[in-house]
Amino acid sequence: FSKEVTVNVVRPGKTGADEIKQMMTNFRNNPPKELGGSKVVLWKDFLKLEALHEDGSKTKLDMPATSNVLQWFCNDGTKVSVRPSGTEPKIKFYLEVKGDMKNASEYDALEAKGMEKVNAIKKGLRLD
């Protein structure tokens, strides 16, 4: 089971652009250690082309320079990607949560549990 939710945080005007820039700086300098109760084990910064591992080691991302994107990966498969929009006054969060589904009858329960996790992540990142 996998569920992805996009959260758009709109901050119009010059002050909004400054706020979005500051949010990215804060996330880059102080990345979350947990998301919705799950431990973050890998942090990727596609602007710096750098990955920070749970043990504190850093590795370079072997790819061409890309964009101002951060990704956080948890021990349970949860993933959060964050990036400012290039064309609109907003910052976008892509939240992905996972669960083991053995048969279709478990879907509704996993969907509800997935949304609980998404809401916990949003609360932890102060996106509500």
Enumerate the language-model features and the residues they cover:
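Phosphate-binding and adjacent anionic-ligand microenvironments
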Residues: 1-83, 101-104, 114-118, 122-128
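Intrinsically disordered, low-complexity regulatory segments enriched in Ser/Thr/Pro
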Residues: 83-108
